A protein has these predicted regions:
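Flexible, membrane-associating and regulatory peripheral segments of lipid-active enzymes
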Residues: 1-85, 95-99
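Serine-dependent carboxylesterase/thioesterase catalytic core
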Residues: 116-219
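A generic structural signal for well-ordered alpha-helical segments
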Residues: 97, 126, 220, 292-293
């Protein structure tokens, strides 16, 4: 599932810093920097064992049915109501969970709501739950969860959250938000397109990247929550659409990226990371994401079962 690359030039146990990766990108090119960052993640003690475990689980047939007793609850991405075909509603996650007979649900956040607005909705929803749950967020939904974790009553709200699957989450903002709100002619055309579809982009002001922005804060992840992040690690040759290539190129000055996320930021997140070689922010071109999601859910089921279903 995770294609092996040529030997890395960095020690496999040391994840390079953002500065080091940018130096490599300047000296050797963005593709070389992306390759080395990917290899460092894949070969690190923290993430490598997890990646190998997930890959081993993917070879099992048929998949074992869900044992943990906790439902998978989706925190959807932007436009999940207006454009469910985009996958922002978490359909892929729900379908794989249902293959395991895992119950699913969705937190009804505002499709284009502010971070503060959706953070409150998430906390209120979780406060009403009396059982363990596993959260799974998509893209902007990850930012909404991050801000929910900063709410005053987050400790109480998240006490029953056993794990969090962060699928391409924009946890630190994205430089693309500023570009999309700029006076660039292409950005103006993009905004006009969304306006005609009745889809406002005002929420992008919350997703700005850099010092002083709303997401320029530490992720306050409770120790009891097991976090798993899934993100794409593409080279330029992997990007099959003109839009994906333009987005990737605009972020190249920050180092390896998926067209929306800066990958050195992704690597600095707590928890475990599964890097998908060759995929962009929307996990394109076509990869076997279905099998990967199924395997990660099985991994969480095995890891959490003893804690969520104690034996008498």
């Amino acid at each position: 599932m995770n294609t092996q690359m040529t030997p890395a030039l960095l020690e496999p146990w040391a994840l390079p810093t953002a500065g080091k990766i940018q130096e490599i990108a300047t000296r050797e090119g963005i593709d070389a920097a992306t390759t080395q960052l990917y290899q460092s993640v894949s070969e690190s003690p923290q993430h490598g064992a997890f990646i190998r475990r997930v890959d081993e689980i993917s070879t099992r047939t048929p998949p074992r049915k869900w044992q943990a007793g906790a439902p998978l609850i989706i925190v959807p991405g932007a436009f999940y109501r207006e454009n469910p075909r985009s996958g922002a509603d978490g359909r892929l996650l729900r379908e794989q969970a249902e293959r395991l007979d895992c119950p699913t649900g969705i937190i009804p956040i505002v499709s284009c709501g502010t971070l503060k607005q959706n953070a409150r909705i998430i906390c209120d929803w979780l406060l009403d739950q009396g059982q363990p749950v596993i959260l799974a967020s998509l893209s902007k939904g990850g930012a909404d969860v991050k801000m929910a974790l900063a709410e005053p009553d987050a400790a109480e709200a998240f006490k029953n959250v056993a794990a969090w699957v962060n699928l391409c989450g924009i946890l630190n903002g994205t430089p693309m938000a500023e570009w999309l709100l700029s006076r660039n002619p292409a950005a103006l055309l993009n905004r006009l397109y969304y306006t005609f579809r009745g889809q406002g982009l005002g929420f992008l002001r919350d997703l700005g990247y850099g010092p002083g922005r709303p997401l320029d804060c530490a992720l306050q992840l409770p120790h009891h929550i097991r976090m798993v992040t899934i993100a794409g690690f593409p080279l330029r040759e992997h990007l099959s659409s003109a839009l994906a290539r333009r987005c990737h190129r605009r972020l190249t000055y920050l180092g390896p990226n998926d067209g929306s996320l800066v990958l050195s930021d992704v690597c600095a997140l707590p928890g475990l990371l599964y890097p998908i070689w060759g995929a962009d922010h929307y996990l394109r071109p076509q990869t076997d994401v279905n099998q990967l999601v199924l395997s990660i859910l099985q991994y969480l089921d095995e890891e959490l079962q003893w804690r969520l279903c104690p034996q008498s």
